[in-house]
A protein has these predicted regions:
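Active-site rim beta-loop-alpha module in soluble metabolic enzymes
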Residues: 157-198
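Active-site-proximal alpha-helical scaffolds that flank and shape metal-associated catalytic sites
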Residues: 151-155
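Early transmembrane hairpin module of multi-pass membrane proteins
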Residues: 2-149, 163-167, 198-261
């Protein structure tokens, strides 16, 4: 099969995935109705103010961990093992990582559904650009080029749909949740079921483990705050683990090396 056929096949797969996600959303939406945002989501544990200036300081300031990870990726960008067709996906991932720090800090400064949009939007783009890069490593290199914009548009659509539905009085998080959970599951399955084209898989595993720990901290925000005697909340630790996960991904892109075709199929 020649390069033209490969490119056409990858594009078909990309749009098949996008269509399947849209169909799954439609089925679940018709079957179960909208999934509203829990109003209690904004009632986070750490409400302390820093120097009388920074409200909810723990959750605001720990976004520095995410910013540091994004800047780490930016510093490594020119030294990453990345094919030309994957450069755009890497640039999107780095930019969205930096924007996640600012979007999250903005949300935690004044937690509302309106500000939460700017937290979730770059997160969705991070996840979908990462999925494109992992599929490039595990399925076909052209996924990095051909999937990055359709995938990130799909992720952004989940956030925008939720924002619009909230404004209309019937919030629906369903598509965003499919993107958020589905991306993690898809990456885990790709790591288990498909052979890599590059070394360094351990760093992707580290990112996935960080994601699992992050979810734990998010779920037990108040409990962690109580157990640490009010030192740090679960949500603040979530931000730290996001930074660890992103740094692990960027280090994977930096240290990985291309495997031979024979080795990658073992």
């Amino acid at each position: 099969m020649n390069d033209v056929d490969d490119a056409a096949r990858v594009r078909r797969r990309v749009w098949l995935i996008v269509g399947a996600v849209a169909a799954l959303y439609g089925f679940l939406r018709l079957s179960f109705g909208p999934l509203p945002q829990d109003p209690a989501y904004h009632l986070l544990a750490d409400t302390r103010t820093f120097l009388g200036v920074v409200p909810r300081a723990g959750d605001v300031l720990t976004n520095l961990a995410i910013l540091a990870a994004g800047l780490f990726g930016l510093a490594l960008r020119t030294r990453m093992t990345v094919a030309p067709e994957a450069r755009t996906a890497v640039n999107v991932l780095i930019a969205a990582s930096v924007l996640t720090a600012f979007g999250s800090a903005y949300y935690h400064w004044a937690p509302t559904n309106a500000t939460l949009i700017w937290d979730r939007l770059p997160i969705a783009i991070v996840l979908m650009s990462l999925l494109a890069l992992v599929m490039a490593d595990r399925v076909h290199p052209l996924f990095a080029r051909d999937a990055v914009w359709p995938f990130t548009a799909l992720g952004a659509a989940g956030v925008i749909l939720w924002g619009i539905s909230e404004a209309m009085g019937q919030g629906d998080l369903l598509l965003y949740l499919i993107v958020r959970v589905g991306t993690g599951v898809a990456i885990a399955l790709l790591l288990i079921l498909r052979q890599p084209r590059h070394t360094g898989t351990i760093w992707l595993v580290a990112a996935l483990v960080s994601e699992i720990i992050m979810a734990f901290f998010e779920r037990f925000d108040h409990e962690v705050f109580r157990l640490t005697g009010g030192l740090v909340s679960g949500h603040s630790m979530k931000h730290v683990m996001v930074g660890v996960a992103l740094a692990s991904v960027f280090w994977w892109l930096r240290v990985r090396r291309m495997l031979t075709e024979k080795t990658s199929r073992r």
